[in-house]
Amino acid sequence: MNTHVKPSKLIKGATGDWEIIIGLEVHAQVTSRSKLFSGASTQFGAEPNSNVSLVDAAMPGMLPVINEECVAQAVRTGLGLKAQINLRSVFDRKNYFYPDLPQGYQISQYKSPIVGEGIVIVDVSPTEQIEVGIERLHLEQDAGKSLHDQSATDSFVDLNRSGVALMEIVSKPDMRSADEARAYVSKLRTILRYLGTCDGNMEQGSLRADVNVSVRRPGEPFGTRCEIKNVNSIRFIGQAIETEARRQIGILEDGGVIDQETRLFDPGKGETRSMRSKEEAHDYRYFPDPDLLPLEFDQAYVDGLASALPELPDAKKARFMNDYGLPAYDAGVLVADKETADYYETTVNYNGVKRDPKLVANWVTGDVAAYANSVGLPVSQTHLTPAQIATLVDLISEEVISGKIAKDVLAILINEDKAGDPRTIVEARGLKQVTDTGAIEAAVDAIIAANPDKVAQAQAKPTMLGWFVGQVMKQTGGKANPQAVNEILKAKLGI
């Protein structure tokens, strides 16, 4: 494994190799009941303009008041990103005009953000791990929403989102492929969900990304970057990067130059298109907001929040590998979702019984996860309980049933007896494994007698043993103990 080493990810152009340089600005909606500078609700899906205070609507004389919970959530996130927490930060006005920005400016943080540099360790694949640097995290207000599809002649504005707290998490340009960018956003979302600082729901706009892409020849300075705004799914982030990189390579190989600009990704057409020329900081005329004092707190405040942080994904993965002996891949899959990790741990320790951790992991990440995906639910929200899966694993370990029969029992739990006890189901339906060697020998003898040609083939080619095992299992309804079947067949066939 290339731990903490970023391999070069080159793509082929018509005139040689190119390297993609990627940085992401992720906008994460802060989990809080009220907005950043007002007491209005942050409820999603409310009637248009029903969650709007006078501050959000920029009524004259209305002054912003900082929401302490949003500050705490930003600090928690910074701690989760192993980042520098700045004890003094400043809110600035970012000036621009848009119909859904009633103040005519956005309250953000420019020169003095609440969180400084940090790092995220990302598993790109089972054999590749990279570090992505965090440049900064700052708090800012979200804008409202312009609606252009309600009328043929008019546009409408919904200010429910106006003033909702966002954390803008700015990465360093450390990613070199779409796969790395996708893995980074997935890991970042997992960290935020563990911390409880953002729900990470991209469908509702709680997490969206501005994607900065440039290309260069290997070893050359960074090229001119273009920013793709408001990409709202991990899949689209990858597609936008690959599409934009190809566009830039085509221009450069034809002798053109890249214009620094803001672009939009159209997933339907599979292309990016120009939105506007890319603004520089001076275009926004940043200056400290005169209505807000600098935000200051002491180290004791930070330490108090740090002491109450939950176990985070990297620490949980390390513990699963150490305490349960799980391979890195299995541990990584389990901890990618906090509820799934909790479900696994409850299952493996159910009733104080020590179960085979790897076997439990195989069931949770295999058949149980497959069922959860088929019904569009997380593992923890299906009707399959840790108690049921623990009992199923116990029955396999006790050799009461085989793995194949266990799958049949799971199907019964899914389709017929949702609240059933696997042990009761096995008893009631006569699914116990046949361990009587006499009965198994009788089945083996019958199959050998009926297939003399196959016997000769198996003796010449031992891999044919699998055919005989299958026939015995079929004759016993899948109930024969597989280990006993193998041993008896080998003895009878002389292989």
Swiss-Prot record:
**Which EC class, in a word?**
ligase
Q: GO molecular function of the protein, one example?
A: glutaminyl-tRNA synthase (glutamine-hydrolyzing) activity
Catalytic activity of the protein:
L-glutamyl-tRNA(Gln) + L-glutamine + ATP + H2O = L-glutaminyl-tRNA(Gln) + L-glutamate + ADP + phosphate + H(+); L-aspartyl-tRNA(Asn) + L-glutamine + ATP + H2O = L-asparaginyl-tRNA(Asn) + L-glutamate + ADP + phosphate + 2 H(+)
Give the matching InterPro entries: Asn/Gln-tRNA_amidoTrfase_suB/E (IPR017959), Asn/Gln-tRNA_Trfase_suB/E_cat (IPR006075), Asn/Gln_amidotransferase (IPR018027), Asn/Gln_tRNA_amidoTrase-B-like (IPR003789), GatB (IPR004413), GatB_C_1 (IPR042114), GatB_Yqey_C_2 (IPR023168), Gln-tRNA_amidoTrfase_suB_CS (IPR017958)
> What is the E.C. number?
6.3.5.-
Give one GO biological process term.
translation
PROSITE patterns named in the record: GATB
Provide this UniProt record's keywords sorted from A to Z: ATP-binding, Ligase, Nucleotide-binding, Protein biosynthesis
Similarity remark = Belongs to the GatB/GatE family. GatB subfamily.
The free-text function statement in the UniProt record for this protein reads: Allows the formation of correctly charged Asn-tRNA(Asn) or Gln-tRNA(Gln) through the transamidation of misacylated Asp-tRNA(Asn) or Glu-tRNA(Gln) in organisms which lack either or both of asparaginyl-tRNA or glutaminyl-tRNA synthetases. The reaction takes place in the presence of glutamine and ATP through an activated phospho-Asp-tRNA(Asn) or phospho-Glu-tRNA(Gln).
| Subunit description | Heterotrimer of A, B and C subunits.
Q: What is this protein called?
A: Aspartyl/glutamyl-tRNA(Asn/Gln) amidotransferase subunit B
- Give the originating organism: Beijerinckia indica subsp. indica (strain ATCC 9039 / DSM 1715 / NCIMB 8712)
